[in-house]
Amino acid sequence: MSEAKELDPATQFKQLYDQEYLSVFRSIRAVVLDAAAAEDLTQETFVRAYRARHRYTPTAPPGAWLRRIGINLAISHLRRQKLARFLPARLYMAPDRRDYDRAEARDVVGKAMTALSPKLRAAIVLHYYDGLTREEIAAVLGVPAGTVASRIAKAVAIMRKTIGNDQESDTTRSTSEGALRGR
């Protein structure tokens, strides 16, 4: 993350946009699980940040401030659209087994992410995908670091349970299918 600094209206904001756009987009996309919605929400993040630039106080890096705006917009979007349990269909072209395994792992993790509330998903995304520390996540989300730690722990537990249940049902399904075929 960049260090805290004042936001100069035109030039610095353009530089900030260029520097932080991809990071903000990735964070939002990982929360909403929809690239088109993430694109719109990222644009809205920068519009709102530009309009509120006079209220920004440089106590934290501008990137953290932008992510906070973006994550809040993503959570609001999920609430409005009731998309918290929606996983977009993904088609992967897998030329070899390793690519197939990675695609399958992305699907499993993506499905497990849909079992999380938007607040838990935001904590997981910022920690594991963006590599932020608990303190940095706390600054982005506006909550204590202890709350971030408990959200991450709760999210990991839910995801483990979800993935475990899916693997058990796959095993049961393949065993029963084999029994039906006389195997």
Give the residues covered by each predicted segment.
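A short, charge-rich alpha-helical start-of-domain segment used by transcription regulators
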Residues: S2-R26, E39, Y50, R121
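Sigma70-family region 2
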Residues: K5-E6, E44-P61, R80-K82
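Amphipathic, Lys/Arg- and hydrophobic-enriched alpha-helical face
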Residues: L16-A35, A52, M113, T162-N165
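Hydrophobic-face residues of short alpha-helical interaction/recognition segments
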Residues: V24, I28, R53, L66, ...
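Structural recognition of an alpha-helix C-terminal capping motif at a helix-to-coil junction
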Residues: D40-V47, A60-N72
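DNA-recognition helix of helix-turn-helix
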Residues: I71, I75, L141-D166
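Short, basic/polar amphipathic helix motif occurring as a linker/hinge flanking DNA-binding modules
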Residues: H77-E104, Q167-R173
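A short pre-motif secondary-structure segment
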Residues: A123-H127
